Every structure is written in structure tokens, then in C-alpha cells.
Amino acid sequence: MSQQTTASSEYLDESKTFSSFQLDLRLQQSLKSSGFHHPTLIQSSAIPLALEQKRDIIAKASTGSGKTLAYLIPVVQTILEHKSTQGADRTTGTLGVVLVPTRELAQQVRVVLEKLVLYCSKDIRLLNISANVDDSVLGPLLAENPEIIISTPSQLVKILEGKHLQTISLRDLRFLVIDEVDLILTFGYQEDLLKISQYLPLKKNLQAFLMSATLNEEIQELKTKFCRSPAILKLNDDEINKNKNKLLQYYVKVSEFDKFLLCYVIFKLSLIKGKTIIFVNTIDRGYRLKLVLEQFGIRSCILNSELPLNSRQHIVDEFNKNVYQLLIATDDNEYIEEEDEETVEAGEEGSEKLEEGGEKLEEITSKTSSTNGKQKIAKKDKEYGASRGVDFQNVSCVLNFDLPTTAKSYVHRIGRTARAGKSGTAISFVVPLKEYGKHKPSMLVTAKKDEKILARVIKQQSKLGFQIEPYNFDVKQIEGFRYRMEDGFRAVTQVAVREARVKELKQELLASEKLKRHFEENPHDLDSLRHDKELHPARVQQHLKRVPDYLLPEAARETGKKIGFVPFHNPKKNRKGKVAKRKPGRKSDPLKNFK
């Protein structure tokens, strides 16, 4: 969910205001304080259906269209009405559960919800249980029976099946929200959702919200399980995207080693203005790139699934505040064994089947390509996600240092830029098959299928009305930097990468756990905690940090402009620059020379 202050004007419904929905005055005040005046298109459609007709909602809308408030406003409004009618006999159970695929998204929903209940926090308490919290701490928090619980499916199942079953109460549950449904299914949470359904009062007028960026036939099972005659809303963001078309997409065919060379040239010469996210496919790959860039004095910060949740959230927050300009993000949650090309062309067949069992009340929209494939979930923290859902703001460029393994992942990655009506650039490095495996130290297994994946991506994007063009540059201009990259890359060994990985993890664990309470009491001290410090586990060659003028193009050379006329010879000065001294003669006896 994007704030309205950063949302594109194409998404706003200026014919309505939030007062049109007859919301609680406290909600209207909090919305006004946050800068929200007009609802977005998806909000103006979903809120009346949820509040007045009590319909289940299945909504398809892209990131930044206001999906989060589209379900939070009806949930909070109904809970406030429920509490006001009950009076002294207020229920003590949890009334709403919000399920999200990653812990980062859970944190974002918590922040939005806290702002929404700013003036009614005594009536509505919320709890984010997505993070791993000690049982001695979690028990008392659940015993307070918060009105709204935010969690990932796996964490909620863990609590329901554990010793906290008697502590948490879902018997009075009124709302179930499943946000980013397509991503939840991609991460393999189907079994967790079925387990959760056993603890829900599905036959007691439970209102469900299924929010997603795409609708496919996989959602049909969830629709049958949780919804009763839902209202299906589709936002016409394809027309919006075609109108603005501010995302420029390029690909560069380079060898494995030249990926590092191009990165060095691009960021050392500041060829990209603004903030950049670099996506890599493995954690080691991210640290290797960071260490190589450090050899040339280029600072960056790392975001991956090994880091603690608090550190990951702080990195995202600081990146959004423009503290860092370069973020290296590991996108290692999805590994695809084989992707069927027919699924890339499937289009909206899944959403058509979905609409058969429900009433399609409003179609603000369009056709969106969806991809499905045989998936193998990586054994990492599957509740981490950088390429999807995380609210990165004002990103100028997305650089796919390693091409993703599917066309679907490509769409998720480039979706981090050109958001809310702003322009952006996506650049992808592609390794030709003939270049694969020639440079073993920089080799990556997934690069073997780069050309095959690129063909699918181009085909998919062309169906959506976008073009991916080859990025042409003069190879001779960067050849002068090659010997410097070879020196810098040679210093970053596998041992150095492993040491950097351990050192970074130790630093972040210390900052995340031991200093957590201190930072809560002293929030200003948190500003001094940086994540882009140099790790220095490799041998750093200081001369590589400076680019000599002879490597720069003539337009970028400034030495000749600053230095004035320097004469070849100055006869007034001694050639050595100082007066010559006479050599002392033979030492004389001071007693004989005394007068």
C-alpha cells in the first residue's frame, strides 16, 4: 500500500472523499492526518461493498493502488461499530486476522494500521506476531486478546498448534484478510492456510478479503474455502501503465566477469542518478559484489534472508530516507526447475474461472499476464522477500545483476521502480550461452539459461505493451578499466566472502538484539546505525579507489581546467629550489684562531 501523498493521480477517485463512506470520526481524522483526502479506485469500490453489503472481497490491483487501506478501513470501522453496540459486554476475543507472505510486509501493514487507529488505539489493539518472539514474551501479549493480529501463515500455525492454543482465541473472529495471495501460494503456504481454516468460525458470517496483484486458477481453491458469493474487483492498471509508460527496460549481453566490470564503471562514474537496487540470485553473490565494489570505494548495503528481521526493516527504512543510494538485494526464495512457456501465454484464464463462482460486480479493468511453473522453494527464510511487496520508495533504477529464473520474478523485480507515476529504468545483465563457464570465479549456475529466460520475458512484456531494448555502448570506453577490475576482483577470494558474511551477520545480530531496547528508549541513536560500512575482509588496494584522468572521457577530465599555465623553466630560482651551501673547509683549531 502506498500513501496517497506518493500515489499516482491515475489511481485516485477524486469524485469521492473518505467522508462519503460515513466512517467513524476518529478514522476520518487519522486519514486526514496521514494526508489521505480522496480514496483510490480500489478503495472507493471495496469499502462500500464491505461495509454496506458485508460482501467478501476478491481484489486484483497492482502495488501502490491502495490495497492495504481497502481492507483495513472496513475491518477497523466494523470493529468500532461492534464495540460501540456491545457496550459493557465487549467481547474479549480477536476479531481480525491479517495474513501476509513475508515479515517485511507484516511490519508495513502494522505501521499503516497504527496510523489508522491513532485516535482509537484504546478500542483497537493490534499485535504483529510474524517475528520469532520468545514464548515468555509472546504468551502475555496473546493473553491480552488484541482485536487485530498480523502474521505470516506459518507463524500463526505454529502458535495455534503449540502451547499458546489456549491463550489465543479465534472463536469470535469476524474478518480474515489474505494479502498478496499469489505470493502466499508461490511460497508454498497452501497447507498452512488449510490448517488455519480448521480453527476459524467459517460458518459464523466470517468476512474474507483476498487481495492480489494477479488472479489465477490457484486462487479458486481459497475462494471456495473462505468466501461466500464474493465481489470480484479488478483495477484497470494496464490502461494506466500504457498511458504513462514511464518504465524503460534494457538488457545487456555480457560475459560473467564483465558484469562486475560494468557495475564498477556505472557506479564509479555515477552514470545512474538516484537510488538503485541491484538484484542477485545468491547470498554469496551479493557479498562478493559488495566486496568488489568496496575495492573501488563504492559503498553499498546488503539485504538478504540471513539478516535479522529488525535489521532488514531498518535497512529498508533508511533506504527510503535516502541514507543509502545503492542496495544489493538477494532474491533467492524462488528457484524454478522448469517453466512451461504455455503458462506465460495463459493470460487471464485463471481469473475467468474464478469469476464463474462469484458475481463480478465491477471491472475497473484489464488483462494481466500470470505465470505458473513447477516450483522448488529454497530452504532459506521463506518469510523474507525483497522483490515483491516491500515498500521501496523513489527507486530510480533496478539492475538485474543476475537475471531471475522466471519471467514472473522479473516482473516482481522491475516493479520496485517506476511506481506511483514516477519514471524508472530496469537494466538486466544477460550471459550468452557461449560465454557461460569461461570465467569460473564469477560463474553462476542460473546464468546458463539466461537467453532462454530473456526470450520469455520479452514475449511476456510485449503482450503487456512494453518493449525491452538492447542497451548499446562503446566497449572500447570501458576496456581501460579492465586491468583495475582484474586487480580488485582477484583480491576478493571465496574465503574473504565467507568472512564478510560471518562478520556482517555478527554485526547485525548485535545491533538487532542487544541494542533493540536501547534504540526503543533512544530512537535518535538509531540514526547513527549504518549498514553500508566497509567490511574489509579482503585486501584493499587504496590506489584503486581513485580513477586516473587518462581513463575518463575528455568531458569528465577536470585536471587541465584547474591547473593554469606552468612555465617550463624559471631562471630566477635554483634548479633544485634552494640556495647551494659551500662545503666546509679544513677544520681549524679554535684556540689558535681566538682573538
Swiss-Prot record:
Q: Which domain of life is it from?
A: Eukaryota
Q: In the Enzyme Commission scheme, what number(s) does this protein have?
A: 3.6.4.13
Q: Which reaction does it catalyse?
A: ATP + H2O = ADP + phosphate + H(+)
Which residue ranges does the record annotate as region Disordered? 340-376, 562-595
Against Gene3D superfamilies, the record matches this protein to: P-loop containing nucleotide triphosphate hydrolases
**GO molecular-function term, one example from the UniProt record:** ATP binding
List, as start-end ranges, the regions of compositional bias called Basic residues. Answer: 570-585
Tell me which UniProt keywords the record has, alphabetically: ATP-binding, Helicase, Hydrolase, Nucleotide-binding, Nucleus, Ribosome biogenesis, RNA-binding, rRNA processing
Per the record, where are the segments of Basic and acidic residues compositional bias?
350-365, 586-595
Q: Which residues form the Helicase ATP-binding domain?
A: 48-233
Instruction: Please give the chief subcellular localization of this protein.
Output: nucleus
- What does the comment on domains in this protein's record state? The Q motif is unique to and characteristic of the DEAD box family of RNA helicases and controls ATP binding and hydrolysis.
Give the function comment from the record.
ATP-binding RNA helicase involved in the biogenesis of 60S ribosomal subunits and is required for the normal formation of 25S and 5.8S rRNAs.
Q: Per its record, how is this protein called by name?
A: ATP-dependent RNA helicase DBP9
Instruction: Specify the species.
Output: Eremothecium gossypii (strain ATCC 10895 / CBS 109.51 / FGSC 9923 / NRRL Y-1056)
Organism placement in taxonomy: Eukaryota, Fungi, Dikarya, Ascomycota, Saccharomycotina
State the gene name recorded for this protein: DBP9
